[in-house]
C-alpha cells in the first residue's frame, strides 16, 4: 500500500465501516475544517461510516502572491495556464492512494465517496 505523506484525520460513526467518505478541504484550510461533518449530517442510525479528511500539501499559491499554504494545486492569474496546474497530478495520485487504501480495508468501491469544498 502506498504511503500518504500528509496528515489524515479519520472519524468513524461506528465499528467496521461499510462505506467511506473522503472529503477535501478548501484552499488554505486543513483537515480539521470538516471535523464536525459527521455530526452536521443527518446520517442514518446504525450504518458505520468512515470519514477520511486529508491535509493538502503546503505549496506556494500564485494567486495569493506566492504565499505558502495548503492547496491541492497552484492557482494562478493566467486563464491560459493549461489544463493541469502545478500539483494537480500529485493530488490526484494522493486521492487514488486514499481510495485504494479504503478498498484494501474492506470498503467496496461502490461505497466510496470523494468530495470536497
What is each of the regions a protein language model found here?
Residues 116:
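The Walker A (P-loop) glycine that initiates the GxxxxGKT/S ATP-binding motif of P-loop NTPases
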Residues 2-113:
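Serine-hydrolase catalytic machinery in alpha/beta-hydrolase-like enzymes
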Amino acid at each position: 500500500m502506498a504511503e500518504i505523506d500528509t496528515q489524515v484525520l479519520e472519524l468513524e460513526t461506528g465499528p467496521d465501516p461499510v462505506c467511506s467518505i473522503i472529503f477535501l478541504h478548501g484552499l488554505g484550510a486543513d483537515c480539521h475544517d470538516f471535523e464536525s461533518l459527521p455530526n452536521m449530517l443527518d446520517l442514518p442510525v446504525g450504518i458505520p461510516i468512515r470519514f477520511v479528511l486529508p491535509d493538502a500539501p503546503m505549496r506556494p499559491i500564485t494567486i495569493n502572491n506566492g504565499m505558502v499554504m495548503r492547496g491541492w494545486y497552484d492557482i494562478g492569474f493566467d486563464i491560459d495556464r493549461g489544463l493541469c496546474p502545478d500539483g494537480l497530478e500529485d493530488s490526484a495520485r494522493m486521492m487514488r492512494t486514499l481510495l485504494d487504501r479504503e478498498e484494501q480495508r474492506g470498503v467496496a468501491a461502490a461505497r466510496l465517496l470523494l468530495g470536497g469544498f
